[in-house]
């Protein structure tokens, strides 16, 4: 869905809001693509947080190198 949204989105500060309105109003099923993208991203982060919780529960934080790599990947995902 991100590729379809990127085809119509402009990141310029003056036109960003109007490009989102254009996606929702003028693109065929643009509102659906935007909602699917938002829900998919939310589901991805829920899965990531569950994975972190699983690691905490099973004591994986004791493996320092693995845990630090996971934290770096989490921060990169959030950027």
From Swiss-Prot:
Heme b b566 binds at residue 51. InterPro entries: Cyt_b/b6_N, Cytb/b6-like_sf, Di-haem_cyt_TM. The chain crosses the membrane at residues 1-7, 31-52, 67-79. Its cofactor is heme b. It is a multi-pass membrane protein. The keyword Transmembrane helix applies. Heme b b562 binds at residue 37. One of its GO terms (molecular function) is metal ion binding. Binds 2 heme b groups non-covalently. One of its GO terms (cellular component) is mitochondrial inner membrane. Keywords: Electron transport, Heme, Iron, Membrane, Metal-binding, Mitochondrion, Mitochondrion inner membrane, Respiratory chain, Transmembrane, Transmembrane helix, Transport, Ubiquinone. Its main location: mitochondrion. Pfam families: Cytochrome_B. It is found in: Mitochondrion inner membrane. GO terms for biological process: mitochondrial electron transport, ubiquinol to cytochrome c. PANTHER family: CYTOCHROME B. Component of the ubiquinol-cytochrome c reductase complex (complex III or cytochrome b-c1 complex) that is part of the mitochondrial respiratory chain. The b-c1 complex mediates electron transfer from ubiquinol to cytochrome c. Contributes to the generation of a proton gradient across the mitochondrial membrane that is then used for ATP synthesis. Belongs to the cytochrome b family. The cytochrome bc1 complex contains 3 respiratory subunits (MT-CYB, CYC1 and UQCRFS1), 2 core proteins (UQCRC1 and UQCRC2) and probably 6 low-molecular weight proteins. This is Cytochrome b.
């Amino acid at each position: 869905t991100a590729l379809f949204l990127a085809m119509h989105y402009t990141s310029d500060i003056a036109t960003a809001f109007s490009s989102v309105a254009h996606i929702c109003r003028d693109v065929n099923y643009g509102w659906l693509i935007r909602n699917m993208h938002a829900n998919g991203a939310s589901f991805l982060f829920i899965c990531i947080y569950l994975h972190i919780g699983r690691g905490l529960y099973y004591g994986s934080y004791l493996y320092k190198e693995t845990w630090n790599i996971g934290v770096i990947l989490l921060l990169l995902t959030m950027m």
